[in-house]
Structures are given as structure tokens and as C-alpha cells.
Amino acid sequence: MLTLSKGASFRPHYAVLKLPHLHKKWMAYIHDPYPFHYYPRPYNWVEPGYDFKELFFKELSQKAKYSAFPSQLLKEWMSSYFPDFSKTGIVIPHQNEKYEVQNTSFPSYFDISKFNLLHAGNLMKQRSPEGLLKGFILFLENNPSAKEDAKLILLGDASYHTEMLKQYNIPEIYIHNGNKAFDEVYHLQKNVSVNIILEAKGEISPFLPAKFPHCVEADKTILSLAPYYSETRRLLGEDYPFWSEVDDVKKIASLIGKLYQLWKQNPDSLILSRKDLESYVSVTHLKEVMKSLNNNQ
């Protein structure tokens, strides 16, 4: 029996916790830190009734046969608060499901012949794109000719950063502060030069971004802007060259410059080419994980 969580709701977990006869076959999936005050900085949420939620999760960690997490770092993070998770925890990353884009036409703001960098996804208060924007501007200053063929595209709700974003109203940057159709974004991810994964500034980011499997499938170079200790960086590898702290403007500019030079030499050279990650986020891997649990019973 698998119980899933959504947002701040763990109601299915709470319900099964009250049914002891199901505990021996129960897998509790935990998608994010909980209670919310266990989020790493810069997140600083404290919910009403947090003490009750701590007791609830302590009991859950002790009673569920298995606990499942989308990332290794999240499993370790939650185990530091509830040690039983280290015994019962397994990692089930977000998977890719085969999907055919219905609308294959490109939007007016996208020119496939350009050096396009895309960040797709909501920019929460803690995920500021300012370092990326400053880094891109510095890249343009260092490479004046790039103004003819480079474009940074930001798609997704960024209401916390609206005023700051107004400062970057230039032709080389396209910002859509709001939602776009999945088809449109998914199609762009597969056709841009670089996909950007931007995370909050902090000491650690134990989350596996939901778009990570899409970026892996797109097979385009990923520019990872994340803490040194992050699940994205862990999966890409310590030696992955296109990683920077989210606010290191000079390094971001330098990395974009290197990517731009590679693109100028051969626009088709900016591929991710990570069969190991494609396998990791596949349904086949999920089946292998579940089979191993059955074999260990």
C-alpha cells in the first residue's frame, strides 16, 4: 500500500496510521521536508500545530514498513530528525512518462537559430533569479557580439520578484511572469541550447526538482545553479562543469560564456548525454527498486 502526499497535506498517511493491520505492507511517500519548520534555510516556515505534526511524523517513521523519498539527500535530511527513516527509507526519484507534444509550433518569442537558455518553473521567494540575470548581463558585456544571437528565457510565476525583473527589460531577455501551457514549455526544453535548474541560496538543497527528469530527457546541457550540497549536483556529479552557486555572478557569466563558445563551434554539441540519469528516472528503474523490496521480504 502506497500513500502519497501533496503540498502540505499528508492526510492519506494520517489515515493509514490509524489502521495498524496495514502497517506491515505500507509505503509512505514523503515528497518534501515535514513539518515545514524542517525545511532548510532560507525557508523559514513555522506552521500552527507544528508540535502535533512532529509527533505524527515520528509515529509514521516508526510504523510504516517503508518510507520513500524522491532524493537521497531528502532521505538523509529527514533521517536526521526521525532516525527510523534511515532504516526504512528508499529513494524513488521523479520519473519520466512518455509524452508526445501535441503542438510543435514555436512561440513568437523563441528563435531556434539562437543560443537560447531557458529557465522554466516557478520562482518562489527563496529562488531569486537575480544572480542569473546579472550573470547573463555580464556575459553580454564580455561578449558584445552575443547580443545578436543569445537569449535568456524565464517562464513561470515570479510574483515575488516582479519589481526586480522590471530592471531587465532588454531584447536579449524574455520574461513571462505567469504560467505557460505544459506542451509549450516541454517543447522548448527539447529545443533550447541550455536548460537551467535554479535553486534557493543556502547550505543545502535536498530537493529533486520536478523538472529534472524533463531536463534529462531533453538531452540538452544543464546549467545547475544550486548549493554545493544539492541533489541536482549530486546526480550530475562533482566533476560536472556547468554548476555554480546561484549568486556567483562572475562564475555564472563565465559558464554561459563557455557554453556560448561551444555553441558557436557547433550548435549541436550542447547535449547532456547521460544514459545513467535517463535510466535513473525511468519506469524500469522504479520496477527494479520495487522488485528488490519484494526480494528482501
Question: Predicted segment positions?
Answer:
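A charged, aromatic-enriched C-terminal amphipathic alpha-helix characteristic of glycosyltransferases
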Residues: 246-254, 261-296
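A short, active-site helix/loop in glycosyltransferases that binds the activated sugar's phosphate group
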Residues: 59-89
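An aromatic- and histidine-rich active-site surface loop
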Residues: 1-23, 28-31, 36, 244
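Nucleotide-sugar-dependent
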Residues: 127, 181-187, 195-214, 223-234
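Conserved donor-binding/catalytic core segment of Leloir-type glycosyltransferases
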Residues: 108-127, 133-136
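Carbohydrate-associated surface elements
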Residues: 73, 94-95
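Membrane-proximal helix-turn-helix segments that form the acceptor-binding/catalytic region
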Residues: 11, 34, 47-67
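Nucleotide-activated donor-binding/catalytic signature segment of Leloir-type glycosyltransferases, i.e.
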Residues: 147-156, 160-186
